[in-house]
Amino acid sequence: MALLDLQAMDTPAEDSFGELATGSQVSLLVCEYSSLSVVLCTP
Protein backbone atom coordinates (compact mmCIF):
# COMPACT_ATOMS: atom_id res chain seq x y z
CA MET A 1 0.00 0.00 0.00
CA ALA A 2 2.71 2.49 0.99
CA LEU A 3 4.63 1.85 -2.23
CA LEU A 4 1.52 2.52 -4.30
CA ASP A 5 0.90 5.76 -2.39
CA LEU A 6 4.48 6.91 -3.02
CA GLN A 7 4.19 6.13 -6.72
CA ALA A 8 0.93 8.09 -6.91
CA MET A 9 2.62 11.07 -5.24
CA ASP A 10 5.44 10.98 -7.79
CA THR A 11 3.03 10.70 -10.74
CA PRO A 12 2.71 13.86 -12.88
CA ALA A 13 -0.72 15.51 -13.07
CA GLU A 14 -1.07 14.49 -16.72
CA ASP A 15 -1.10 10.85 -15.59
CA SER A 16 -3.98 11.44 -13.19
CA PHE A 17 -6.21 9.11 -15.23
CA GLY A 18 -3.73 6.27 -14.74
CA GLU A 19 -3.60 7.13 -11.06
CA LEU A 20 -7.39 6.83 -10.85
CA ALA A 21 -7.25 3.48 -12.64
CA THR A 22 -4.67 2.25 -10.11
CA GLY A 23 -6.89 3.43 -7.27
CA SER A 24 -9.79 1.49 -8.74
CA GLN A 25 -7.68 -1.67 -8.91
CA VAL A 26 -6.62 -1.23 -5.29
CA SER A 27 -10.24 -0.69 -4.29
CA LEU A 28 -11.24 -3.90 -6.06
CA LEU A 29 -8.52 -5.81 -4.21
CA VAL A 30 -9.70 -4.37 -0.90
CA CYS A 31 -13.30 -5.27 -1.72
CA GLU A 32 -12.37 -8.83 -2.66
CA TYR A 33 -9.89 -9.67 0.08
CA SER A 34 -10.61 -7.40 3.04
CA SER A 35 -13.03 -8.13 5.86
CA LEU A 36 -14.01 -4.45 5.61
CA SER A 37 -15.49 -4.98 2.15
CA VAL A 38 -19.03 -4.69 3.54
CA VAL A 39 -18.22 -1.21 4.85
CA LEU A 40 -16.06 0.04 1.98
CA CYS A 41 -17.87 -1.43 -1.00
CA THR A 42 -21.57 -1.05 -0.34
CA PRO A 43 -23.23 0.72 -3.27
Swiss-Prot record:
Keywords: Signal, Thioether bond
Residues spanning the signal sequence: 1-21
Crosslink position(s): Lanthionine (Ser-Cys): S24-C31, S34-C41
Post-translational modification: Maturation involves the enzymatic conversion of Ser into dehydrated AA and the formation of thioether bonds with cysteine. This is followed by membrane translocation and cleavage of the modified precursor.
Protein's UniProt keywords contain Signal: yes
Residue(s) carrying 2,3-didehydroalanine (Ser): S27, S37
Function of the molecule: Lanthionine-containing peptide devoid of antibiotic properties, involved in the formation of aerial mycelium. Suggested to self-assemble at air-water interfaces, thus providing a film of surfactant through which nascent aerial hyphae can emerge. The aerial hyphae differentiate further into spores.
UniProt similarity note: Belongs to the lanthionine-containing morphogen protein family.
Name this polypeptide is given: Lanthionine-containing peptide SapB
